[in-house]
């Protein structure tokens, strides 16, 4: 759709064409009327030539005005297209910058999350390491405690056996003395046997 100035120019051109047509028609009509009273063909040709020249000049001016209006219209349309292209380019640039900011923010957020996950994994790994070390120490202490208890139990068992054997020998020695049949050799034999058994339970 044309602008108000384009419509005004077109209307002016139409009026100019109408004026030219009316002027030419009037000239031809007057020439035909005068032809009945005048016989000077040279004057008629001269007048007709001037009228044709005037018409040619007016037609040239009219053509120039029309061409100028078309060029102006084309330039206006070109300017509108350029302005629209510039606006679209600016909008595209703004949209691209917005996307860049969004992606930059997302990338920064993802980097922070990755760093946080890495820190959490390192902390969990260190905690798991400490837990395993603590469990290993507890197991070693438990084994050592069980070994100590087992050794103490064996010592107590050996002591009990030694005490029982010592009691048995004492009873046997007492019985022999009571019987009056023990001699020095038998006494030494009993003592040596007792000492050997004591050495075995150490």
UniProtKB/Swiss-Prot annotation:
GO cellular component: plasma membrane; proton-transporting ATP synthase complex
Entry keywords, A to Z: ATP synthesis, Cell inner membrane, Cell membrane, CF(0), Hydrogen ion transport, Ion transport, Membrane, Transmembrane, Transmembrane helix, Transport
Segments traversing the membrane: 9-29
Subcellular location: Cell inner membrane
Record's bilayer topology term: Single-pass membrane protein
Pfam families: ATP-synt_B
Record-linked InterPro entries: ATP_synth_b/b'su_bac/chlpt
Residues annotated as signal peptide: none
Keyword Hydrolase appears in the UniProt entry: no
GO molecular function, one term: proton-transporting ATP synthase activity, rotational mechanism
UniProt KW Transmembrane keyword: yes
Family: Belongs to the ATPase B chain family.
Subunit structure: F-type ATPases have 2 components, F(1) - the catalytic core - and F(0) - the membrane proton channel. F(1) has five subunits: alpha(3), beta(3), gamma(1), delta(1), epsilon(1). F(0) has three main subunits: a(1), b(2) and c(10-14). The alpha and beta chains form an alternating ring which encloses part of the gamma chain. F(1) is attached to F(0) by a central stalk formed by the gamma and epsilon chains, while a peripheral stalk is formed by the delta and b chains.
Function: F(1)F(0) ATP synthase produces ATP from ADP in the presence of a proton or sodium gradient. F-type ATPases consist of two structural domains, F(1) containing the extramembraneous catalytic core and F(0) containing the membrane proton channel, linked together by a central stalk and a peripheral stalk. During catalysis, ATP synthesis in the catalytic domain of F(1) is coupled via a rotary mechanism of the central stalk subunits to proton translocation.
Annotated protein name in UniProt: ATP synthase subunit b
Taxonomic lineage from the root: Bacteria, Pseudomonadati, Thermodesulfobacteriota, Desulfuromonadia, Desulfuromonadales
């Amino acid at each position: 759709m044309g602008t108000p100035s384009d419509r005004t120019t077109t209307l002016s051109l139409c009026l100019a064409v109408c004026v030219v047509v009316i002027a030419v028609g009037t000239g031809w009509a007057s020439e035909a009327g005068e032809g009945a009273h005048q016989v000077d063909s040279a004057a008629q040709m001269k007048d007709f030539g001037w009228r044709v020249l005037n018409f040619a000049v007016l037609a040239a001016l009219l053509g120039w005005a029309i061409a100028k209006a078309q060029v102006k219209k084309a330039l206006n349309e070109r300017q509108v297209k350029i302005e629209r292209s510039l606006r679209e380019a600016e909008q595209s640039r703004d949209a691209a910058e917005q996307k860049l900011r969004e992606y930059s923010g997302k990338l920064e957020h993802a980097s922070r999350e990755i760093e946080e996950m890495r820190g959490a994994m390192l902390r969990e790994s260190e905690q798991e390491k400490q837990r395993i070390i603590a469990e290993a120490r507890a197991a070693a202490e438990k084994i050592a405690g069980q070994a100590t208890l087992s050794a103490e139990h064996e010592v107590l068992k050996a002591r009990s056996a030694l005490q029982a054997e010592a009691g048995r020998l004492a009873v046997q020695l007492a019985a022999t003395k009571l019987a009056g049949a023990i001699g020095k050799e038998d006494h030494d034999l009993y003592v040596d046997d007792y000492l050997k058994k004591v050495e075995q339970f150490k």
